[in-house]
Design a protein with these regions (language model features):
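Extracytoplasmic "Venus flytrap"
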Residues: 35, 42-63, 85-92, 114-115
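Short beta-strand elements in bilobed, periplasmic/extracellular small-molecule ligand-binding domains
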Residues: 75-87, 150-153
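Short, well-structured alpha-helical segments in soluble
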Residues: 83-84, 88-108
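Sec/Tat-exported extracytoplasmic proteins
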Residues: 48-51, 66-73, 102-105, 111-114
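Extracytoplasmic ligand/sensor domains, especially the bilobed periplasmic-binding protein
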Residues: 106-157
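Signal peptide-proximal N-terminal region
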Residues: 30-31, 59-82
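Short, low-complexity disordered leader/linker segments with a strong preference
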Residues: 1-40, 71
Length: 157
């Protein structure tokens, strides 16, 4: 594997780890997650549609990072598990995708979407549910700060 891919995978794993551990306090859902043998993380990416290449490659990198963490023993002995969801490269679908991940799949964090428009549609849902969202590719300056206010549950690399 090329060096930059190793560095990118390690950086993504570190970012996911930091977000997961930051979001592990309080709440029944978080208590349930703390008692299981795995940490369930949602991945809402553009797997079909106009920008599917962005989503597919980012999901591939996330899987590599999670595999490395799991091979090293996981986080506090717990394995990471990804629940994938295709937002079809559409902001309205991104909202639906993230809603399902948060409310039905009960993930403790969401990685993705890849594009700024899909992230913008997703952050109100994750914020309302106090679930961290990591936007690994989105570039809009309003992803993490809007009107001078830092978004508490949104992280960008």
């Amino acid at each position: 594997m090329k060096t930059w891919k190793k560095v990118a995978s390690a950086a993504l794993a570190a970012m996911v780890f930091a977000s997961l551990t930051a979001g592990c306090g309080g709440g029944d859902k978080k208590k349930e997650a703390a008692n299981s043998n795995e940490i369930v993380v949602g991945a809402s990416f553009e797997l079909t549609g106009n920008v599917a290449n962005y989503g597919k490659s980012t999901l591939s990198g996330l899987k590599m990072a999670f595999d490395e963490v799991n091979k090293a023993g996981g986080i506090d002995g717990k394995k990471l598990r990804i629940v994938e969801s295709d937002n079809k490269s559409e902001p309205s679908e991104a909202g639906n995708s993230v809603t399902k991940l948060v409310t039905q799949d009960k993930v403790i964090a969401v990685v993705g979407p890849a594009t700024s428009g899909c992230v913008a549609a997703s952050t109100p849902i994750t914020t309302a549910n106090k679930v961290p969202l990591i936007a690994p590719c989105a570039t809009a300056p309003t992803i993490t700060v809007e009107h001078g206010n830092v978004k508490e549950f949104v992280f960008s690399s």
